[in-house]
């Protein structure tokens, strides 16, 4: 052993081969400050070992290296930009020092090699991957770019265009694809990885492979003519501008860095990377996207903990109500491996549910993501039934019948009489109080809400709603089942609208007030989509949700919060609903939903909608983009703050992820609380105070004012003030 640290070691094997092993004390290998310090020591030990003839880099984990420890490096990100660039240089210098070892080097990639893990392999002369490995540079998903030499080495290995694609998409590549592009040199079965890597390394040691020639291009400028560089850069920039847009700066900064460093040697190119990395790390988008990554880890961590605490395992499920929603729930459960009974009262409904599941699966097969055998296996996990007897042995029931408290209560009471006493009963409801529904069951401790979002197979969020009598064991089991289904569960306490709908409808109220004052709904949509970043503006979103559904939810929210969310007179949503303009579901809402010449769906502003709304709205008035954004977002942010203060949702991280996963809040803004803190609490309060005459939804809470006064952050403070 020539070096032994807590995470890294270097051992001299036979024939002068040094095994440089990453084997951290935790579950995965990642780059943190302690690992960097050991990395420097390993390089020194190898350089001082006179018997060393070559180096193989290995992992003692099932993964290779998952990347950098972003939680630790966030402290460095708080530095000024020039200091951050210096920090990035120190980190990338460590990789350079390894690459400069005057011995052949090879990486034996046994599993995931992402971010810094991928960059570790790029610093080697050769790369051999197991068939189970994956490799990529996903930093763009955090609003960042590679910072350990990825922008320098990858384009010199696989070419400008391929490297631009790798980095701007953040995609992880399977070994075969990486091999075809030249990112790795061989692919072998996992059991042969070590032997294959050592065999290739010996060829390099013996001079049968020219490792110096293999390394040299990574130290020089790219082999591109001026014309080739112009063509490649123009194409890449055009594609990125179209896909990423103005709100996500990382892809364009990466491409500009590649362009700037194309004619530079490693030293110059590294300096360009250090500068670009520091620039991106200081952007609001990076702060937001890193925050989302960490929030997602919070949710996953809670789900993992729930899985360990759950005393009731869910091995068989049932869904009551086989409509589109029931079919989607059945598909998701079956697809992720939990057999499910799909029960309804008539064959037509069962056919609809099966058609929904089959349609989702067929698309998977058509896109090459699933074969026919897998599709058949998933369908075999779904058992349609007209009888309650079929569900008597299930571990969990998801009731998904019509959104009517009387109907739901009746169905819940019926099925509770059939299932086992320790079976869990849940209701997929978007608005009906769980405590109200619990009055229909005899074992309320085994009952909670399980709010899926449509379409179930695409929307990640599930709200697990705790009633006043719901047991911790029930919550843990349902969270574990949702996670098993591949969903991101967030536990919320029962209240009107739960969490997502409760904070969404004040946003819709802001929209309705603007329209009544003369704003054009298409202008509002344009501002909220193009400038704020929502995937759909409020009018379009209402059409997609369903104008009838939105009108119903507005009534629920009005009953629950009669002062703050009282029904708006001549609400545009109610006006359209009264005239049977239900949105996308019947082809007419704020927009007319038609098909273009190629048969693709499209929307056009509906003249009839303008006519109907004009009967109650003020004359047309133009509002500035700033005012539209303020009047739309203040009510939502205020309601999220109230939910945190009341303990409806536990943490700011979960509050933000609920909006990202549930309604498509722009990820580059990081969620409502991240948006609030990016604006600055004092600035938000000053903005909201301008609109207090518009109603209580624009009034900030005393708790928010106290947070601003004390300079606290919602991400580091217990905010349950109510």
From Swiss-Prot:
Q: Where is this region: 3-hydroxyacyl-CoA dehydrogenase?
A: 311-722
Q: Which residues cross the membrane?
A: none
EC number in record: 4.2.1.17, 5.1.2.3, 5.3.3.8, 1.1.1.35
- Which residues are substrate-binding? 296, 501, 661
Q: Where is this region: Enoyl-CoA hydratase/isomerase?
A: 1-189
- Supply the PROSITE patterns for this chain: 3HCDH, ENOYL_COA_HYDRATASE
A single BP term in Gene Ontology: fatty acid beta-oxidation
Which residues are marked as site: Important for catalytic activity?
119, 139
Q: Which Gene3D superfamilies does the annotation name?
A: 1.10.1040.50, 2-enoyl-CoA Hydratase, Chain A, domain 1, NAD(P)-binding Rossmann-like Domain
GO cellular component terms attached to this protein's record: fatty acid beta-oxidation multienzyme complex
Among PANTHER family, the record links this protein to: TRIFUNCTIONAL ENZYME SUBUNIT ALPHA (PTHR43612), TRIFUNCTIONAL ENZYME SUBUNIT ALPHA, MITOCHONDRIAL (PTHR43612:SF3)
- What task does this protein carry out? Involved in the aerobic and anaerobic degradation of long-chain fatty acids via beta-oxidation cycle. Catalyzes the formation of 3-oxoacyl-CoA from enoyl-CoA via L-3-hydroxyacyl-CoA. It can also use D-3-hydroxyacyl-CoA and cis-3-enoyl-CoA as substrate.
Protein name from the UniProt record = Fatty acid oxidation complex subunit alpha
> Encoded by which gene?
fadB
